[in-house]
């Protein structure tokens, strides 16, 4: 659905943020892109709906080249983005009006806008707050409203660019639960950009970036079994994977691909 072909991006002559990235994002996939600050993951995210254009290489969304200006509107209809700070995406003083803002700008008929707003608020569990003021909501609730605003545009792909970074643990869980449900129940393609490795455990595939390059990819189990390699690139592991590696280093015979608490407990129990 999205094809990234040998993409390099330079902010200026001295700063190359992406270095020869090639990647395909499949329809209906839950993809996590992880890396430390400055790894290039957010720069890559902004290429997915033509907010940034490659210095070299090519990005296609359903066959549409993002560098062709005539394609921009259709690409942004297909690929919606939710950013780190929900306050930057909330533009009105009433929740339902904010969710309606995008469809209104697309010229969607009023009856269709009402349907989309109702469905979007229901999808994120915020229908009871339709007439509320966004500034009175918690961070997690605001981010759910930002997601609802994207859903009302009816995109095929939802990109979350560190959308949980400013939230407390409860807010993060709320957002991740909603995104997971959209992927499972609606078949929506989801791309999660995150520095929280545990968030990537729910993905179908994990992409690891460092210094503007793609350095690893695979299922969460495949990627997070490579603990030493990831740590060598300055990356953390999910807490269970970190504990697993410490136990292995301490001499315990535990499979290197254990990534959940249940699996770790099952591996440890026979050793007692």
What are these regions (language model features)?
Residues 58-74:
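ABC ATPase NBD Q-loop/coupling interface
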Residues 111-129:
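Conserved ABC ATPase "signature" region
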Residues 158-161:
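Catalytic Walker B motif of ABC-type/P-loop ATPase nucleotide-binding domains
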Residues 49:
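Helix-to-loop junction immediately C-terminal to a conserved catalytic motif
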Residues 133-137, 141:
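Conserved ABC ATPase signature
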Residues 34-36:
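The feature captures the beta-strand-to-loop junction immediately N-terminal to the Walker
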């Amino acid at each position: 659905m999205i094809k990234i072909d040998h993409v390099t991006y330079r902010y200026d002559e001295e700063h190359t943020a992406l270095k020869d990235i090639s990647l395909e994002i499949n329809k209906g996939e839950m993809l996590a892109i992880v890396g430390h600050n400055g790894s290039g993951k957010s720069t890559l995210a902004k290429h997915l709906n033509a907010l940034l254009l490659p210095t070299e290489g090519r990005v296609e969304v359903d066959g549409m080249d993002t560098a062709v200006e005539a394609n921009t509107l259709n690409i942004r209809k297909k690929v919606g983005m939710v950013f780190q700070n929900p306050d930057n995406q909330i533009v009105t003083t009433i929740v339902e009006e904010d969710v309606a803002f995008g469809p209104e700008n697309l010229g969607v008929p009023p009856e269709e806008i009402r349907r989309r707003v109702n469905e979007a608020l229901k999808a994120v569990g915020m229908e009871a707050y339709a007439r509320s003021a966004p500034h009175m909501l918690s961070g997690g609730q605001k981010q759910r409203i930002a997601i609802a605003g994207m859903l009302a545009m009816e995109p095929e792909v939802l990109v979350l660019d560190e959308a949980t970074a400013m939230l407390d643990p409860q807010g993060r869980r709320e957002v991740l639960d909603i995104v997971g449900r959209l992927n499972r129940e609606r078949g929506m393609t989801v791309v999660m950009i995150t520095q929280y490795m545990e968030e990537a455990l729910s993905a179908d595939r994990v992409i690891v970036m460092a210094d503007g390059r793609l350095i690893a990819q695979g299922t969460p189990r495949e990627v997070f079994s490579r603990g030493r390699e990831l740590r060598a690139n300055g990356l953390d592991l999910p807490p269970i994977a970190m504990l697993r590696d410490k136990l292995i280093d301490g001499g315990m015979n535990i499979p290197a691909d254990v990534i959940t608490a249940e699996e770790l407990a099952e591996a440890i129990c026979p050793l007692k």
